């Protein structure tokens, strides 16, 4: 995933093979931002994600949080990149996360329709002050009314696994969405543009509209060539 987003050739220690996406088009830039106490070698993409994979012991462990954010056609690419970097630094890195982000502008892949966006991959484990990886979860033991640990049928203390950070919570995700919306709209206002975005759904905005479905590059290419698709027809019906 990291190689694809960055358009690079990376070697996986776990799989013992290279992932080569150096021929992938549309990758404008990619960066890794670190919190102050993170080892500087994590600025190397292969080192970072191989280390993340090595620290996990369970073969099905989730390695990273990953999400995409749309950039704005009303802004220049330089402005979009600066805005993306500011968001990643302020909302993610300043909270202790290592963040790997890449800006894409795959015009040709999307049938000529500008679709700038950026991908973000962040670490799930916090980094301790000494630069080592912290725990994803901690044990919170179940206590009785007298403060003693409750035992299960096998005589072992019962506990709940509690996340050590709030990074994966719905509330945090909402904060990120709201922060991005605010940053973009502030930029629009500063440039004197009469346009705004809203991170809320139509339902939350009180708007009686049906959202369009995501078409993707293949559908957009077909539509650009005059080939009508089911998703294209549905979106035309929604917009009518």
Locations of regions flagged by a protein language model:
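N-terminal nicking endonuclease/strand-transfer module with a His-rich metal-binding environment
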Residues: 1-240
């Amino acid at each position: 995933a990291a190689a694809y987003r960055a358009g690079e050739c990376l070697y996986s220690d776990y799989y013992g093979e290279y992932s080569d996406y150096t021929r992938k088009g549309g990758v404008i830039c990619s960066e890794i931002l670190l919190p102050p106490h993170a080892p500087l070698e994590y600025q190397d993409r292969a080192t970072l994600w191989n280390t993340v994979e090595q620290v996990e012991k369970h073969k099905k462990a989730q390695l990273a949080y990953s999400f995409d954010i749309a950039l704005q056609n009303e802004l220049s690419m330089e402005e979009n990149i600066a805005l993306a970097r500011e968001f990643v630094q302020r909302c993610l890195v300043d909270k202790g996360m290592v963040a790997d982000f890449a800006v894409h502008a795959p015009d040709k892949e999307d049938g000529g329709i500008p679709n700038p966006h950026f991908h973000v991959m962040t670490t799930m484990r916090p980094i301790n002050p000494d630069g080592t990886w912290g725990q994803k979860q901690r044990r919170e033991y179940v206590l009785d009314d007298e403060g003693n640990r409750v035992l299960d049928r096998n005589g072992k203390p019962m506990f709940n696994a509690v996340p050590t950070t709030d990074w994966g919570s719905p509330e945090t995700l909402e904060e990120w969405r709201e922060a991005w919306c605010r940053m973009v709209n502030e930029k629009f206002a500063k440039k004197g543009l009469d346009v705004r975005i809203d991170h809320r759904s139509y339902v939350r905005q009180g708007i009686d509209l049906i959202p369009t479905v995501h078409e993707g590059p293949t559908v957009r290419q077909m539509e650009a060539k005059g080939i009508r698709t089911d998703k294209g027809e549905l979106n035309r019906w929604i917009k009518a």
